[in-house]
Amino acid sequence: MVLPMQNKIVKIGNIEVANDKPFVLFAGLNVLESRDLAMQVCEHFVKVTDKLKIPYVFKSSFDKANRSSIHSYRGPGMEEGLKIFAELKKTFGVKVITDVHEIHQAKPVAEVVDVIQLPAFLARQTDLVEAMARTGAVINVKKPQFLSPGQMGNIVDKFAECGNDKIILCDRGTNFGYDNLVVDTLGFNIMKKVSKGSPVILDATHALQCRDPFGAASGGRRGQVAELSRAGLAVGLAGLFIESHPNPDKALCDGPSALPLSKVEPFLQQMKALDDLVKSFPELNTEN
């Protein structure tokens, strides 16, 4: 007989992140372009999520360290970025998530933000995992595009061995040949199992990247962000990870995948309705 899986709850302040709880929205800018833009985007998300009663965490990067071209905009850097994050937290009372790329960044970043993120390309770097684990912060682990869902258990185990079990797993698509990504929704349950019920979320905007094989920046398919997000929530997820911009065509990074800020409210109305419906169903075991 197959016993039901226990869903682990990870707390971000008073926000509970779990696969059987109402979905949490991790959303904001791909990269900090300016203090004023960050304030504008964060304020809009706070207003909409308060109205719809959706738990919310602001996301952005202070340094996009893995841009395709050395000439691409990377961000304001850690020092200025942390000042902006601190101001957002003070002004709007919002929780914040951002990524770290180097060992020395883990501690100072964790002292300001509420969740630190392990980037997909760095997810198997043991020294970085150890440094992040030691902060005691909640960790969001991006699943590498090249890694199977089952292999995520090894990364979770690394964090546990280093004393941190406050782990969220984030799917951002899987390589499908060259320069294309697909989302394997069957993999969500595998990640839940190998992580012993850790929360699993979907990065629906990054998963829509579609590269020009000879280009210096990613293309994208933002016209499909709603359908991909619905597909993820239909499986039963702890949250969505969404990037947005007031003018995606002018965004300094990943604009082709970004949800227009003007579409945030109708988008979230749909997502909340679907999530509420899916999580109202009793668990159905079809294995026996």
UniProtKB/Swiss-Prot annotation:
GO biological process: keto-3-deoxy-D-manno-octulosonic acid biosynthetic process
Cell division is among the record's keywords: no
Record keywords, A-Z: Cytoplasm, Lipopolysaccharide biosynthesis, Transferase
MF terms in GO: 3-deoxy-8-phosphooctulonate synthase activity
Catalytic activity field: D-arabinose 5-phosphate + phosphoenolpyruvate + H2O = 3-deoxy-alpha-D-manno-2-octulosonate-8-phosphate + phosphate
Location(s), subcellular: Cytoplasm
Taxonomic superkingdom: Bacteria
GO cellular component: cytoplasm
Metabolic or biological pathway, per its Swiss-Prot or TrEMBL entry: Carbohydrate biosynthesis; 3-deoxy-D-manno-octulosonate biosynthesis; 3-deoxy-D-manno-octulosonate from D-ribulose 5-phosphate: step 2/3; Bacterial outer membrane biogenesis; lipopolysaccharide biosynthesis
Documented EC number(s): 2.5.1.55
Top EC group: transferase
Main location group: cytoplasm
Record-linked InterPro entries: Aldolase_TIM, DAHP1/KDSA, KDO8P_synthase
Assigned protein family: Belongs to the KdsA family.
Protein name: 2-dehydro-3-deoxyphosphooctonate aldolase
Organism, as annotated: Bdellovibrio bacteriovorus (strain ATCC 15356 / DSM 50701 / NCIMB 9529 / HD100)
Encoding gene per record: kdsA
